[in-house]
Swiss-Prot record:
This is Membrane protein MLC1. Transmembrane protein mainly expressed in brain astrocytes that may play a role in transport across the blood-brain and brain-cerebrospinal fluid barriers. Regulates the response of astrocytes to hypo-osmosis by promoting calcium influx. May function as regulatory protein of membrane protein complexes such as ion channels. It is found in: Membrane; Cell membrane; Cytoplasm, Perinuclear region; Endoplasmic reticulum. GO terms for biological process: caveolin-mediated endocytosis; cellular response to cholesterol; positive regulation of intracellular transport; protein transport; regulation of response to osmotic stress; vesicle-mediated transport. It is a multi-pass membrane protein. The lineage of its organism: Eukaryota, Metazoa, Chordata, Craniata, Vertebrata. Expressed in the brain, with highest levels found in the amygdala, nucleus caudatus, thalamus and hippocampus. One of its GO terms (molecular function) is protein-containing complex binding. Keywords: Cell membrane, Cytoplasm, Disease variant, Endoplasmic reticulum, Membrane, Phosphoprotein, Transmembrane, Transmembrane helix. The chain crosses the membrane at residues 52-72, 82-100, 111-131, 144-164, 199-219, 230-250, 257-277, 304-324. Residues 1-23 have a biased composition (Basic and acidic residues). Residues 1-36 are annotated as: Disordered. It comes from Homo sapiens (Human). InterPro entries: Membrane_MLC1 (IPR033280).
Length: 377
């Protein structure tokens, strides 16, 4: 009987100070359960088998058709220049299709501008073919080239229709039941360093391509063609706005800037690939130049065209990568519960953090009252 008070006192001393005032310790529940503290890859993915199959199939068909079109357009460089342009414009759509197939979300609607701009380029190439056929019917052999051109047009039309009919509502419904676990995840990081590096390389590549285009225009007036003027124009249009938008979005990311950057990159990427496809005939000329040894000095004009082609490909790849990075950030922000429609300020974010842990604030107050009572006793 005499040892019972000492046992109670010993047990009371072992109890933490902040836990003494709790009336019902068993009813305490932590804010985050171990099952909730999981990485995003452990969350049930918003996966669509139809989207995956469509993306892989469409990307494969576009790559194969574009490859055959580029080869045939380089075999007949003067007669099938429209085929090279159409094939080049479809390359970013193929890249985006494979990127979509690797994601666990339906991100096809976010590339709608890119698909529409590519479809506009292929339609223009089809009209170009019709005009050449009307002006000189005997010079054009309607054969496999028309089949490839129509196939590219149909593939892009199907992509545009599917992208227009796709939506992210199903994905949002699947993610709706996971809002509690998504709130504890960290905010989605914006790829600022990647976009800044892209913008620097884009400016350097654009200036180099502009200087190369000016030099190529002044090499020989007899060999200068309209393709150089068109390429020169699209370099000026595509390079600097995209680089400036990338740098500004990396400095202060917001919904408006990300959407503008996606739109600019989606518009300029197919156009740059179109110009690259048109200039791809310089590769065959360089190969023919090195067949005979020693190579002739006169075809140095083709070397400039090849360098211009490489810079255009670099610029087009950076624009496509920018669009993919921005869409990836946008989709990740939506799926992880971050606010995309409205930008939260610091006060709203702090209020949200306090609202997430009401039990902690309540327990601290009760514990402080318990400490005051014990000190008074």
């Amino acid at each position: 009987m005499t040892q019972e008070p000492f046992r109670e006192e010993l047990a009371y001393d072992r109890m933490p100070t902040l836990e003494r005032g709790r009336q019902d310790p068993a009813s305490y529940a932590p804010d985050a359960k171990p099952s909730d503290l999981q990485l995003s890859k452990r969350l049930p993915p918003c996966f669509s088998h139809k989207t995956w199959v469509f993306s892989v199939l469409m990307g494969s068909c576009l790559l194969v058709t574009s490859g055959f079109s580029l080869y045939l357009g380089n075999v007949f460089p003067a007669e099938m220049d429209y085929l090279r342009c159409a094939a080049g414009s479809c390359i970013p759509s193929a890249i985006v299709s494979f990127t979509v197939s690797r994601r666990n979300a339906n991100v096809i609607p976010n590339f709608q501008i890119l698909f529409v701009s590519t479809f506009a380029v292929t339609t223009t190439c089809l009209i170009w073919f019709g005009c050449k056929l009307v002006l000189n019917p005997s010079a054009i052999n309607i054969n496999f080239n028309l089949i490839l051109l129509l196939l590219l047009e149909l593939l892009m039309a199907a992509t545009v229709i599917i992208a227009a009919r796709s939506s992210e509502e199903d994905c949002k419904k699947k993610k709706g039941s996971m809002s509690d676990s998504a709130n504890i995840l960290d905010e989605v990081p914006f790829p600022a360093r990647v976009l800044k590096s892209y913008s620097v390389v884009e400016v350097i590549a654009g200036i180099s391509a502009v200087l190369g285009g000016i030099i190529a225009l002044n090499v020989d007036d007899s060999v200068s063609g309209p393709h150089l003027s068109v390429t020169f124009f699209w370099i000026l249009v595509a390079c600097f706005p995209s680089a400036i938008a990338s740098h500004v979005a990396a400095e202060c990311p917001s919904k408006c800037l990300v959407e503008v950057l996606i739109a600019i990159s989606s518009l300029t990427s197919p156009l740059l690939f179109t110009a690259s496809g048109y200039l791809s005939f310089s590769i065959m000329r360089i190969v023919e130049m090195f067949k005979d040894y020693p190579p002739a000095i006169k075809p140095s004009y083709d070397v400039l065209l090849l360098l211009l082609l490489l810079v255009l490909l670099l610029q087009a790849g950076l624009n496509t990568g920018t669009a993919i990075q921005c869409v990836r950030f946008k989709v990740s922000a939506r799926l992880q519960g971050a606010s995309w429609d409205t930008q939260n300020g610091p006060q709203e974010r702090l209020a949200g953090e306090v609202a997430r842990s009401p039990l902690k604030e309540f327990d601290k107050e009760k514990a402080w009252r318990a400490v005051v009572v014990q000190m008074a006793q």
